[in-house]
Amino acid sequence: MKNKNLILAVVALVIGALSATASRADDPDFLAFSTGWFDFNRKKDQGGELRLEYRLNKKLWEFKPFGTLAVVSNGMTFLGAGVLMDIYLGRRWVVTPSFAPTWWRGKTDDLDLGHGVEFRSQLEFAYRFDDRSRLGLSISHYSNAGLGDSNPGTESLMVNYSIPLGNFSKMFK
């Protein structure tokens, strides 16, 4: 039974990968807007987080560069750039893991992330519309990876809307 399930899983992955080839080929640059809950898991200094990202469609292997700016209602800010990879599950669903070193500022009495450099790792799961815009959920982890004396880290839970830049410019015509 295990072998049968493994074979079915491999077949499903191959079919998904083949059907996603056309989807992968026509993706543009994106402007991504996100809002969500900062420090939702540890609850040391919770707040609302707003994020803006510019996601380029230029690829190095399967990796795409992006820039990010996040502001939190507790006064923290994160500015950085990193890489992401879009993994297509058929025509409509996209899983996007990403990684970005960021410059952090805004220590509060309740939460000190321990160093000015914070690394953000994120996993996003999104639905892709006909116009190629995406609506998704993501979970992010911020950590200084041991660069500071302390490394408390924190997580964010976000709702993301990514709009192709071509669609964005059409809104203002």
Task: List where the protein language model places each region.
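Outer-membrane beta-barrel "beta-signal"
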Residues: 48, 152-173
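Residue-level signature of outer-membrane beta-barrel architecture
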Residues: 54-58, 85-87, 127, 163-165
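Cleavable N-terminal export/targeting peptides
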Residues: 1-27, 166-173
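Outer-membrane beta-barrel initiation region
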Residues: 23-56, 167-171
